């Protein structure tokens, strides 16, 4: 610590030595000033400086009521207090003469080094450095945080007695406002001894203060180095504030170690996240391509890329969000993004920015609105159901029923490009297949059926899906004629370009006039299930005729009948030689 050995002039010492001590002069100057406030220098009255309450506390602390009085209190020099108030006090001794203060010092300016030492020293050391000698009474005034700091930050406790209230901590009235503002800051260090006289000029500790301020960056914390008065100095109150940040350095270092182990958020995440991100990505998320592909406009720099086909699933919750009402989709936008929590609800007095799902009581729902069925693909009216779409398909001429790919190629042989027909798929995993002519070759592809919709692609969000096969084929014919939308088949041979799919000329099974026998069979097959045909009241040859596979085309029937006749004749020929 830095102390200044500044004493009084020799003339005042000789005048005091020449006088005989009176009864009140036997007391130490601090007790004498406490008993007689008029003995203070002009302009330093307690009531005028801190008010009547603080003045009374100062007098009680000066009389030693805050701690046990006795000779145990030591001065800075190591001796006992010369005050005659304790039992058997030693006679007062005049202080040794010291050099006068330099003209360039400012008594109201306190260096950062003293503030650091004051913040780091213990209360026991502060008890040893405080004394009731006459040198402390003549010390210069410190910052306004001295009295308030000792009254608020160092309360008397059971372990350590409170520090006697020093009267030399009084400041001129010009420093009152700043001292009152910094009452919560740590107390400044004990002042160097010297006479109480106003001095002006720059401090010789300015260079050390500047070095410390650069080291601890106290200028940026206090908002600048000017201190608000336009000069380059800071008042003692501001220095006390910087000392408070320095004394907290140890605790903040420990807190930084703890916080360093926790996951920190970046500035962008902390600005846009209202709640904690500790359970990140706990559930499945929906790809942004799948969500926004239908919302891209023509002005998008990139064309809409079709998302990959999903895994096959029979769950009813796969694509149920596409048919829910708008209020259900708009309100919990995060419901499809299950990893992010929902934002907090708005206050009750503020209008909602988006419609929310309000819980409806059972009694209110019965009287307010009729029950509405969930509009999912499996619950539709009978006109658009799967069975109705199949009944509608049977009336179309380009549907040939059960037919393999060889027979389809025979039907399309010699037809122009764009000719097509629809038949039952030979693969049990699929329902229908499409056979068409393109580039002089007959191609075959399976038609996808996903949740009651038909298309050539299995993706559920494919925009050209239809509820019935007839509707899909009609739209495909329309797109093929105007050329706005084309289908392409990926080639199984690597390196070959995809094959365009154009449906222009349907090959109808009604192109040839059928026999009455064939039409009757066709009608029976429409009305009777194939497993109920043997129960019909008909002769066995007629039942076998009705149960034949190719009941849509009589020519195929004739062809098969000829093959059967040949096989029967061969079997007969083999049986005859053996007999």
From Swiss-Prot:
Which body tissues produce this protein?
Widely expressed with higher expression in brain and testis where it is expressed by spermatocytes and early spermatids. Also significantly expressed in spleen, skeletal muscle and kidney.
| UniProt cross-references to PROSITE patterns, sorted A to Z | SH2 (PS50001), SOCS (PS50225)
Question: What does the entry list under GO cellular component?
Answer: Cul5-RING ubiquitin ligase complex; cytoplasm; nucleus; plasma membrane
Question: Does the record's keyword annotation contain rRNA-binding?
Answer: no
Deletion phenotype:
Mice are smaller and half of them develop fatal hydrocephalus between 3 to 15 weeks of age. They display subtle alterations in glucose homeostasis with an enhanced response to insulin which causes hypoglycemia. Pancreatic islets become progressively larger. Conditional deletion in neuronal progenitors leads to impaired cortical lamination due to increased levels of Dab1.
Compositional bias per record (Pro residues), positions renumbered to this chain: 89-99, 155-165, 185-196, 301-311
Instruction: Identify the stretch(es) annotated as Mediates interaction with SORBS3.
Output: 124-492
Output the SUPFAM superfamilies linked to this UniProt entry: SH2 domain, SOCS box-like
Recorded domain comment: The SOCS box domain mediates the interaction with the Elongin BC complex, an adapter module in different E3 ubiquitin ligase complexes.
The protein depicted here goes by the name: Suppressor of cytokine signaling 7
Organism of this sequence: Mus musculus (Mouse)
